Amino acid sequence: YGHNAGGKAPAGFVMKFSPDGKRRELMHMGYRNPVDFCLNRHGEMFVYDADMEWDMGSPWYRPTRLCHAVSGSEFGWRSGTGKWPTWYADSLPQVVDIGPGSPVGVNFGTGTKFPEKYQRAVYLCDWTFGTMYAVHLQPRGASYVGIREEFVARAPLPLTDVAIGDDGAMYFT
């Protein structure tokens, strides 16, 4: 019964295909629903993962989150109470929790004509709450921790995606 009844781990994942489509590689997994991802200027991948609304209020609820998707990473999402605790040695922590919402578009500010702090930020769009967050990354060990900032918000503003134009402007829908 319920969401994903009988579904097996690893649930959401990111896969890489060769240009000819003959080879594929499972890059990282353990997401609930990795809606979008982007690459920073160093080629590191960051994934915006969705929450499971049915779990809200339960001890195993996981909010929407930004994950630093290093090769072979596992983020531990499983249905219901089966989620891996964040202290498992082979489960990577998220960069930042966003909270309840509907993740959609994500992009880095690289190429904008914004102040430097915002050029380095990753931008996350939330459809439900009409909010775009700027997440400022700080190195922590081999990964990052993020500090979120409300960048654009309005009701109604059902955001869907964000892009950076050749003119240095940010565009969003």
What positions do the PLM features span?
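Beta-propeller domains with acidic blade repeats across secreted/periplasmic ectodomains
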Residues: 1-173
